[in-house]
C-alpha cells in the first residue's frame, strides 16, 4: 500500500511529524513501513511556463521555436521537439541551471542555429513512470490546466514534492489498504482526530429507481449490490490534484469519471465501477453466475471465456463485467458518455479470487475484495463518488440508491478482562489507559467493573476475540514501553528422553560404522511411494503438489536414499555409505489421516576397505551390512529374540534378502538390490537395510549389568556340520545356544563350504563354541556332556551330521 504523506495530511493533523518520524511510529505500532520514496528528489529549477508563441523551427521540420513566459521579466526562447506543444499552453519548464533526474543539468544551447534557454518537459522527464502518464501526454509534454500560475513551482503542482510511504501490510490488516484506514491508524498512534470527507451534492428531481433495477441471483457470492445514476456528465480530464494523487499511488489517470472511482477506491478501500448507462443495454442489473463458455471482452480488449464458477454483472442477457475483477469493454465510459451507472457492491472474496486466478486478471479491486472490504462503506463510497462525479464531470445525481441487500451488518462486541490483559502482557495497564487506546482507535467502550465491553467497527474485521484487543492495547501502548522481564522458573537438570537418547545412539553408531547421514524429501512420486515398504498401506496423495515427483508421502526411506547414492556415484564417487533417520507415512484405511512412524535405513555400495599396504581391498557384501545391523541392535540392547529369516522382496535380490524379526514380529529387512533395480539406478552390488525405529526404540530391554572378568579358563570346541543347503547358519546357531545352556558363552561361524566331496543338496557349516563356568574350572567330562547335548539337538532338529 502506497501512502501519500501530503494526502494523509488531509485526514489527520501531522504537525511535528516528518515522513521519517511518522514511518518510525507506524512501524513501531506493528505495521512495517518498507520504504519512503521522495517524489521529485534531486529535481530543482522546474517552473510552470506559459507558451506565448510557437512557430516552426526554420532549420528543422520536427522542432518548434517557442517563446515562453516563465514568470521573469522577459520571456525566454526554448526549442522543443514535442509534437503537442502549442501556443497558449501552460507547461513544465526546466530553466537554465535546473537539475532533472539522473543529475541532468539544463544549460543554454543552440539547436540547429537557434538559441534554447531551457527545456519544456514531459512527465517522464520529471521522473514519472511512462505507464502512469495519461494517454494524451504519453508521447509529448504535459499541459497544465489553464488557471495554473505562471512561474509557480511545477513540482508542487504535480505533487512531486511529496513523500510516499510504502506499507508492508500483513494479510489480516485489509482495513489499512485505503487512505482512511491508514488515517484511523495514524490518528490512534498520535492521539489525534480523523477528518472524514464530506458529501454535499444536490440530488435531481428524477429517481434512480425509474432508470435501473437490481436483481441478485446468488446472495452468497454477492450479498449487497448498490447502483446510482448520474445524468448529463461531460467526460474530460479529472482535476490535476486528483490525477497526481492517483499517479503517486501507482494508478494511471483516464478521465474524470473513471478517476473518481479509482480515487474513492484508494480513499475508502471500496472498489467501484462506472458503466455507460446508454451502452449498458437495459434498465436492469442482474448479478448471476456465468454460463459455461460464456464470453466477455474486458477493458483490456481481451476476450475472456467464463465458467459457471465466475460471477458476472449482466444487463439481463449478456455480461457487462466480471464481478470484482474488471469491467467489460462494451459498456465502458467513453468520451461521449452522458449518463453513468455507478456500481458499489460487496462480493465474496473467494468468488473474486477464483475468477481473478482463472482469468489471469489481478486488479486493485480484486485484491481488496479478496482480502475483505468493510460492508458498511459500500453506500458511503457510492455517495462520495456520486458527489465527486457531479462536481468534476458536471452531472446530476438522481435521487436515491437502487440496491438489493442480504447483509446484516453487525459490529463485533467483545468483553475484555482487565486482569487478562495484565497476565498476557506481563504488566499492569490502567483501565483508563485501555479506554483511551480503544477510543483513539474509534472503538466504543463501556466500563463493566473488571471488564471492558468493546464494540469494534466493521472496518476492523481482523479483531474477533479478546486476544485481538489485547494486541491492540500492546500496539498502541507501545511495545517499547512494555518492560522486559525474565520468567520465574524452578531450576532443573535438562536431559534427553529415553527415546531421544536411543535415537542419538543409533545416529552415533551408524556414523561410527562409516555411514554418512542423509536427509531426503518426505515426498516422492506415485511409483516409488510403496517400494520397499515394511507394511501394506494406502497412499497419501497431495491435492496440490508442486510437482509429480513430490506428490505422495513416502512409505519407505529407501527410494529417495538410493537416489542420493546414485547421484553421488554419477559424480565420480567410487563408494557410498549413507543412512537416514526419518518419517514414513502409513494408513490402514484409504480415507484416514496417515500415521507417522520413524524408520532408519541404510544403503552401502562399493569398497568397504580400500586396497591398503597390509591387505587386499574388500568390497561391500551382505555380511558387512548384516554386521552393521547386528551391531546396531546390540548397541540398543536388543540381543534376544532377533532372527534373520530368508525372504523375498520384489525390489531385492532373491536369495540375498532376509526379514529381521523380533520375537516373530517383522521389524525390518536387509538385502542386496535386485539386478533390475541396480540397472535402472546405474548401481552395482548395493546392499540396503531398513528398520522400524519407532517400534525398536520402544522395546523394553534388560539393563546392562556388570559381569566380572572370568577367573577360570574357557574351553573351545569346533564342530563342522553337514546340513541341507536350505538350513541357515542362524537357525543352527539358535539351536546351539538353546542346547548349550548357561555354560555356552559364545558361538560363531568360521567356515561355510559347498562343493567337491559334498553330497548333492548339502553344505558344511563350521562353528566355534566357547564354554565357561565363572565359578570353577570346567572338567572335560562336563564339557563333553553339554557338547553332546548340542550335537543331539542339532541332529534332532535339522538332521545335522558331523563332517568327517
UniProtKB/Swiss-Prot annotation:
Family annotation (PROSITE patterns): B5, FDX_ACB, TRBD
GO-annotated cellular components: phenylalanine-tRNA ligase complex
Group of enzyme by EC: ligase
Domain tRNA-binding, chain residue ranges per copy: 40-155
SUPFAM superfamilies: Anticodon-binding domain of PheRS, Class II aaRS and biotin synthetases, Nucleic acid-binding proteins, PheT/TilS domain, Putative DNA-binding domain
Binding-site list for Mg(2+): 462, 468, 471-472
SMART domains: B3_4, B5, FDX-ACB
Note on how the cofactor is bound: Binds 2 magnesium ions per tetramer.
Pfam families per the UniProt record, alphabetical: B3_4 (PF03483), B5 (PF03484), FDX-ACB (PF03147), tRNA_bind (PF01588), tRNA_synthFbeta (PF17759)
This enzyme's EC code(s): 6.1.1.20
KW Protein biosynthesis (keyword) present: yes
CDD domains for the chain: PheRS_beta_core (cd00769), tRNA_bind_bactPheRS (cd02796)
Subunit record text: Tetramer of two alpha and two beta subunits.
Family: Belongs to the phenylalanyl-tRNA synthetase beta subunit family. Type 1 subfamily.
Name of the protein: Phenylalanine--tRNA ligase beta subunit
Highest classification ranks of the organism: Bacteria, Bacillati, Bacillota, Bacilli, Bacillales
Amino acid at each position: 500500500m502506497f501512502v501519500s504523506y501530503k494526502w494523509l495530511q488531509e485526514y489527520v493533523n501531522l504537525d511535528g511529524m516528518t515522513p521519517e518520524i511518522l514511518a518510525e511510529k507506524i512501524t513501531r505500532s506493528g505495521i512495517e513501513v518498507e520504504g519512503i520514496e521522495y517524489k521529485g528528489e534531486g529535481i530543482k529549477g522546474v517552473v510552470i511556463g506559459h507558451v506565448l508563441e510557437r512557430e516552426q523551427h526554420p532549420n528543422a521540420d520536427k522542432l518548434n521555436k517557442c517563446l515562453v513566459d516563465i514568470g521573469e521579466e522577459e520571456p525566454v526562447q526554448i526549442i522543443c521537439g514535442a509534437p503537442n506543444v502549442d501556443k497558449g499552453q501552460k507547461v513544465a519548464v526546466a530553466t537554465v541551471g535546473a537539475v532533472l533526474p539522473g543529475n541532468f543539468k539544463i544549460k543554454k544551447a543552440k539547436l540547429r542555429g537557434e538559441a534554447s534557454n531551457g527545456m519544456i518537459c514531459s512527465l517522464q522527464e520529471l521522473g514519472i513512470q511512462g505507464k502512469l502518464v495519461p494517454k494524451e501526454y504519453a508521447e509529448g509534454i504535459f499541459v497544465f490546466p489553464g488557471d495554473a500560475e505562471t512561474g509557480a513551482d511545477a513540482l508542487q503542482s504535480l505533487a512531486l514534492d511529496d513523500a510516499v510511504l510504502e506499507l508492508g501490510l500483513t494479510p489480516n490488516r485489509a482495513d489499512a489498504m485505503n487512505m482512511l484506514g491508514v488515517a484511523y491508524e495514524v490518528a490512534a498512534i498520535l492521539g489525534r482526530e480523523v477528518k472524514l470527507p464530506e458529501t454535499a451534492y444536490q440530488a435531481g428531481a428524477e429517481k434512480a429507481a425509474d432508470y435501473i433495477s437490481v436483481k441478485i441471483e446468488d446472495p452468497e457470492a454477492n450479498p449487497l449490490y448498490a447502483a446510482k445514476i448520474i445524468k448529463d456528465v461531460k467526460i474530460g480530464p479529472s482535476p490535476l490534484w486528483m490525477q497526481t494523487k492517483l499517479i503517486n499511488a501507482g494508478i494511471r489517470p483516464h478521465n474524470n469519471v473513471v478517476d473518481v472511482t479509482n480515487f474513492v477506491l484508494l480513499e475508502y478501500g471500496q472498489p467501484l465501477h462506472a458503466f455507460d448507462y446508454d451502452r449498458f443495454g437495459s434498465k436492469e442489473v442482474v448479478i448471476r453466475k456465468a454460463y459455461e463458455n460464456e464470453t466477455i471482452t474486458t477493458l483490456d480488449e481481451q476476450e475472456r471465456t467464463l465458467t459457471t464458477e465466475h460471477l458476472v454483472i449482466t444487463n439481463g442477457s449478456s455480461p457487462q463485467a466480471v464481478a470484482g475483477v474488471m469491467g467489460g469493454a462494451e459498456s465502458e465510459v467513453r468520451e461521449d458518455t452522458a449518463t453513468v451507472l455507478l456500481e458499489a457492491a460487496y462480493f465474496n472474496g473467494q468468488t473474486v479470487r477464483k475468477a481473478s486466478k482463472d482469468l489471469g486478471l489481478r486488479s486493485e479491486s480484486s485484491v481488496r475484495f479478496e482480502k475483505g472490504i468493510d460492508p458498511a462503506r459500500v453506500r458511503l463510497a457510492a455517495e462520495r463518488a456520486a458527489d465527486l462525479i457531479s462536481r468534476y464531470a458536471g452531472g446530476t445525481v438522481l435521487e436515491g440508491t437502487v440496491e438489493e441487500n442480504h447483509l446484516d451488518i453487525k459490529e463485533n462486541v467483545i468483553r475484555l478482562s482487565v486482569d487478562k490483559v495484565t497476565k498476557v502482557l506481563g504488566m499492569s495497564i490502567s483501565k483508563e489507559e485501555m479506554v483511551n487506546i480503544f477510543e483513539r482507535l474509534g472503538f466504543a467502550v463501556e466500563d463493566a467493573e473488571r471488564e471492558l465491553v468493546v464494540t469494534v467497527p466493521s472496518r476492523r474485521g481482523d479483531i474477533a476475540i479478546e486476544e485481538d484487543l489485547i494486541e491492540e492495547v500492546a500496539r498502541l501502548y507501545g511495545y517499547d514501553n512494555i518492560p522486559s522481564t525474565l520468567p520465574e522458573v524452578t531450576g532443573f537438570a535438562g536431559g534427553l528422553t529415553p527415546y531421544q537418547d536411543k535415537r542419538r545412539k543409533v545416529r552415533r553408531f551408524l556414523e561410527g560404522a562409516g555411514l554418512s547421514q542423509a536427509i531426503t524429501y518426505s515426498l516422492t512420486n506415485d511409483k516409488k511411494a510403496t517400494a520397499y515398504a515394511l507394511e501394506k498401506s494406502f497412499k497419501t496423495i497431495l491435492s496440490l503438489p508442486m510437482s509429480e515427483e513430490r506428490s505422495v508421502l513416502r512409505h519407505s526411506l529407501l527410494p529417495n536414499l538410493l537416489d542420493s547414492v546414485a547421484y553421488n556415484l554419477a559424480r565420480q564417487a567410487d563408494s557410498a555409505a549413507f543412512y537416514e533417520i526419518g518419517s514414513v507415512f502409513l494408513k490402514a484405511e484409504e480415507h484416514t489421516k496417515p500415521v507417522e512412524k520413524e524408520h532408519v535405513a541404510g544403503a552401502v555400495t562399493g569398497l568397504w576397505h580400500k586396497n591398503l599396504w597390509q591387505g587386499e581391498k574388500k568390497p561391500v557384501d551382505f555380511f558387512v551390512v548384516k554386521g552393521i545391523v547386528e551391531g546396531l541392535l546390540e548397541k540398543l540392547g536388543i540381543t534376544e529374540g532377533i532372527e534373520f529369516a530368508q525372504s523375498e522382496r520384489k525390489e531385492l535380490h532373491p536369495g540375498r534378502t532376509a526379514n529381521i524379526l523380533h520375537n516373530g514380529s517383522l521389524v525390518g529387512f536387509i538385502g542386496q538390490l535386485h539386478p533390475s533395480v541396480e540397472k535402472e539406478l546405474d548401481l552395482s552390488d548395493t546392499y540396503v537395510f531398513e528398520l522400524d525405529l519407532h517400534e525398536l526404540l520402544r522395546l523394553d530391554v534388560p539393563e546392562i549389568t556388570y559381569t566380572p572378568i572370568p577367573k577360570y579358563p574357557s574351553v573351545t570346541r569346533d564342530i563342522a556340520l553337514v546340513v541341507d543347503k536350505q538350513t541357515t547358519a542362524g537357525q543352527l546357531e539358535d539351536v546351539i545356544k538353546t542346547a548349550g545352556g548357561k555354560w555356552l558363552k559364545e558361538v560363531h561361524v568360521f567356515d561355510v563350504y559347498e562343493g567337491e566331496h559334498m553330497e548333492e543338496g548339502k553344505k558344511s557349516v563350521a562353528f566355534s563354541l566357547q564354554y565357561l563356568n565363572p565359578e570353577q574350572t570346567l572338567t572335560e567330562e562336563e564339557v563333553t556332556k553339554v557338547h553332546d547335548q548340542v550335537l543331539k539337538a542339532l541332529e534332532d532338529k535339522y538332521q545335522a551330521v558331523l563332517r568327517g
